């Protein structure tokens, strides 16, 4: 009978333990990643409740043991082995009250932990030899105690080490979870020796020793080691929290300063000054499916800086939770209605007040508000305009929802300041808000005027004339929304200075505007190659580049390609990849694009063709221009023309020079994603003979081409279709015999020669200051 009762009690104990474990959070995954300076990160994922662990470190054997209270383990594989110089194995086990992770190390180590979302990050370093571990008293093993004494012994914990391996839940259910204080150098004892630890020996460990958690060892992952990591290690991560907020984590090891944070419409721009991001680490995350205010996260390089661009949607607010140097956390929260501002918000309301029940018949509203004030603990002040009676019957409703129902029924609204709530008709509160804002505006308009000089560094002061809508006749704020009615702006072109006279708030707005606009403009190096090619060379060039790919059908995407962006020309019915889309010589195929990866091969092909006398490079100019500034290249000569003018009965003759040049005008426009939109104008002028009546006069033959195309950084825009044709007659004869009349024709050979050439222009823009765009001369 006693045996059956014991089994029943044991079964109930196991079931209760399993129920408690199931109700808590579970460890679902363990991942290990590496950081510079031989540091490891063990990322422990939870399904719901997150527990910050408590643990200890041993040096012989080298182990780190971490306990997660009220946590279970939901992993198929609970022993993970690694071929790593520091971490060798991770073992996971659980009992009725907690889960334990044992990290087996190849050498003594130290750790610290950090909670990040639904994960606990464990940072592991090698032990610092300069920090000596505190001495820990050793406890000798005692004779094994009977099972009854073990069951009666209280469950005690030690903060130094454990002399037993972590046993599964079934074994723990039969015996209390006991821990003993042992020497740091003592190896883990078998399970049978653990059960021999008596209650006296557990109690013999002084309270100070039990409470002496190795805080020094846990904190021994110093900030110096993290800061000593090589620079330029940058990464981003995104997750969603329980408040439907987007959490963006930016790790920028080697950056010790503070980021510059600015907001432009629906973009949050975080700039790390003088922190260079490798091109391979640039990335963009589309996170719109997470249903947070964050739609997209982009990490990119801008000159010598690193920019994090957060694209948002809807109403939001930014919270900077950054703490450690080099690690930044930004929380983008959905913006809800603020009781102090009284703004309108159509989002569903969340009520968290204590539930109450109300049942009234024709009761004064002021009485209901008084009851709600007592239930909520808030101080409610009702306006004299709040009156009338209501019939109300509510059961188990949060008090704040009951208050909201009362206000909606009587068109009331509230403003909250601390724990004082002011309730009045909505129109009355809106009138008060308007009066308050008008009073603030009047005070600002009547405030003292100040003058501030802003000397621009990069922009021309005349550019701000159009931005601020200023002119010489009217420099007051009558035509400007930024300047107040009493303010004024003066422009000094000699010193490139803006002189602003206005209130402090307006001057501060000017300061922010100038900081955003007065920045160095990006520069573009435009390299043009003007080539005169024999007829058919463009077709040969397209065939050679197309032959580098594989023949493929239209629906087959396995062929390798150089990556041509686009082209205008014939369609290959077999789907051959032409890397430069110049397969035909028709004028319709006069524009093509070559991606940056193919530009090097294109230059080699042009050099080879020139050595074979198939092409001739007429000019190869390079010009550096700023973004959105026109660059002009001309090559040619001026032709004198005689102009006769008749005036007042007399005539005068003047000589004018007209340009006959090969001109190229390019205006680059850099897009936010690093592409370049080029507006190109090409004119080819040459002298020609024109018939005018019975006379032949000198004229200029003109050919123009205007286009606009988008090219990637380092790509090449090819413009062709400008042809020149020379027709000539040849005469070959035998000396003397060919000069005899009539008979001489037998000794002559006449022929016609047609030389047709195509003018090809290759334009390659490169954004200066970006990786991989160094020019070679």
Curated annotation (Swiss-Prot):
GO biological process, one term: establishment of competence for transformation
Signal peptide coordinates: 1-24
Pfam families linked: AMIN, Secretin, Secretin_N, STN
Xref: InterPro entries: AMIN_dom, GspD/PilQ, NolW-like, NolW-like_sf, Pilus_4_PilQ, Secretin/TonB_short_N, T2SS/T3SS_dom, T2SS_GspD_CS
Compartments reported by the entry: Cell outer membrane
Chain residue ranges for the region called Disordered: 135-156, 197-236
Membrane topology, from the record: Peripheral membrane protein
Predominant cellular place of this UniProt entry's protein: membrane
One CC-aspect GO term: cell outer membrane
Comp. bias regions, Low complexity: 135-154, 197-233
UniProt keyword annotations, A-Z: Cell outer membrane, Competence, Membrane, Protein transport, Signal, Transport
Family annotation (Gene3D superfamilies): 2.60.40.3470, 2.60.40.3500, 3.30.1370.120, 3.30.1370.130
Quaternary structure and partners: Homododecamer. Tetramer of trimer.
Function: Required for type IV pilus biogenesis and competence. Could function as a pore for exit of the pilus but also as a channel for entry of heme and antimicrobial agents and uptake of transforming DNA.
Family listed: Belongs to the bacterial secretin family. PilQ subfamily.
Annotated PANTHER family: DNA UTILIZATION PROTEIN HOFQ (PTHR30604:SF1), PROTEIN TRANSPORT PROTEIN HOFQ (PTHR30604)
Name of protein: Type IV pilus biogenesis and competence protein PilQ
Source lineage: Bacteria, Pseudomonadati, Pseudomonadota, Betaproteobacteria, Neisseriales
Gene from which the chain derives: pilQ
